[in-house]
């Protein structure tokens, strides 16, 4: 049995996203300090921790590049891998939403669905930090 993250009030939203958006295998909401906040239901704790670290690092690098080259705020990042995609989208408070998706997916549709989810969780994440 693989350990899971402790239940978060946002787990059901992130799980619903991963379950209902075609091509998405896993999704994770990562705090501004790189810790997993909410994870899709089939993402083991160890993998959630690893994905959180990767997400935090990539978000930081993308933000640094945007700042260095006057690119404004990073809206999303896409990493295309041989066997799938890693999509990142920033939540208003500096947190990030990560999604792992299959190669044959519609990344435009996933990006759209991520934007909707980010809108839904953004206020909740910000109020939890207060």
Curated annotation (Swiss-Prot):
Alphabetized GO MF terms: serine-type endopeptidase inhibitor activity
Domain of life: Bacteria
InterPro entries in the record: Mycobact_SerProt_Inhib_Rv3364c (IPR053141), Roadblock/LAMTOR2_dom (IPR004942)
Coiled-coil region: none
SMART domains the UniProt entry points to: Robl_LC7
Sorted UniProt keywords: Host cytoplasm, Protease inhibitor, Secreted, Serine protease inhibitor, Virulence
Keyword Lyase: no
A cellular-component GO term for this protein: host cell cytoplasm
Keyword 4Fe-4S on entry: no
Record PANTHER family: SERINE PROTEASE INHIBITOR RV3364C
UniProt similarity note: Belongs to the mycobacterial serine protease inhibitor Rv3364c family.
Record function comment: Effector protein that binds to the host serine protease cathepsin G on the macrophage cell membrane, inhibiting its enzymatic activity and the downstream activation of caspase-1-dependent apoptosis. Thus prevents macrophage pyroptosis and helps M.tuberculosis survival within host cells.
Protein name in UniProt: Serine protease inhibitor Rv3364c
Species annotation: Mycobacterium tuberculosis (strain ATCC 25618 / H37Rv)
